[in-house]
Regions:
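Peripheral, non-AAA+ core regions of ATP-driven protein-machinery
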Residues: 1-200
Length: 200
C-alpha cells in the first residue's frame, strides 16, 4: 500500500465523525509545501465549502460559563485553533472509578489527575472523571494538560472559569506549568475571538 504513496506528489486524508457535516483534510505528504497541514470544510448541498474560521466549529455557543468547561488554544500544524475542553467529575461510591477521555489520551488524563492529587491536594479518587474535546477533534499535544486540569477542578468544585479565559500549557510531574511552542500565535488567535485573559 505504501508503494502508491511514493509515486504521488501529495497524500491527503479526509477525516470526520459519523453524522458530522464537517470534514478535515490532513496532508500526510506534500512535495510542494508543508506536510501535516489541515484544511476544514463543510459539506453542503453545493458540495464542499471551506470553513474560514475553524475555531467557531469547536467553541460553545453558550452565553454564560458553566463548571467543567475551559477554552484551549491548541496548535494543529501551523494553525492555532480554539477548542472547548469539557470535564465531568461525578461521585462514584463503587471501588473502581472510571477515567474516560474523548479526543485526548486516556493515559495522560490519569497522569494529570495524579499530579493534581499530589501537588494541589485535590483528590478525585472516589469520582468518575470524563473529559471530552468538543467537536470531535483529537488533541495530541501536551499543551492541553492545563486545560484538562482546570476543567476537572472546575467541575469538581462546581465553579465556572471566566468566559474570556483561554488556557494552554504542559503540566510537569512536579506540578509546574511549562511553556509550549507557538505561544504568540496562540494568543493572537485567542485575541481575534475576543478572549482577554490567559492561563499558560
Amino acid at each position: 500500500p505504501r508503494v502508491l504513496e511514493h509515486m504521488v506528489d501529495t497524500v491527503l486524508y479526509f477525516e470526520s465523525d459519523l453524522g458530522s457535516r464537517f470534514r478535515i483534510i490532513r496532508t500526510a505528504k506534500n512535495r510542494f509545501g508543508a506536510a501535516n497541514e489541515l484544511g476544514f470544510f463543510v459539506m453542503s448541498e453545493q458540495g464542499f465549502a471551506e470553513v474560514k474560521n475553524p475555531s467557531s466549529i469547536f467553541l460553545s455557543r453558550r452565553t454564560e460559563s458553566v463548571p467543567g468547561s475551559v477554552t484551549l488554544v491548541t496548535q494543529e500544524s501551523s494553525r492555532p485553533l480554539l477548542v472547548e475542553v469539557q470535564a465531568l467529575v461525578d461521585a462514584n461510591p463503587g471501588e473502581s472509578p472510571r477515567r474516560l477521555a474523548q479526543g485526548l489520551d486516556r493515559q495522560r488524563l490519569a497522569l494529570l489527575l495524579a499530579v493534581l492529587h499530589r501537588h494541589s491536594g485535590i483528590s478525585l479518587v472516589g469520582n468518575d472523571v470524563f473529559v471530552n474535546v468538543v467537536g470531535g477533534l483529537r488533541v495530541a499535544e501536551t499543551a492541553s494538560d492545563l486545560a484538562v486540569c482546570l476543567a476537572a477542578v472546575s467541575s469538581y468544585q462546581e465553579r465556572s472559569m471566566p468566559g474570556d479565559l483561554v488556557v494552554f500549557g504542559e503540566v510537569g510531574l512536579t506540578g509546574e506549568v511549562r511553556p509550549v511552542p507557538f505561544g504568540e500565535e496562540r494568543l493572537a488567535e485567542a485575541a481575534k475571538h475576543g478572549f482577554k485573559h490567559r492561563a499558560a
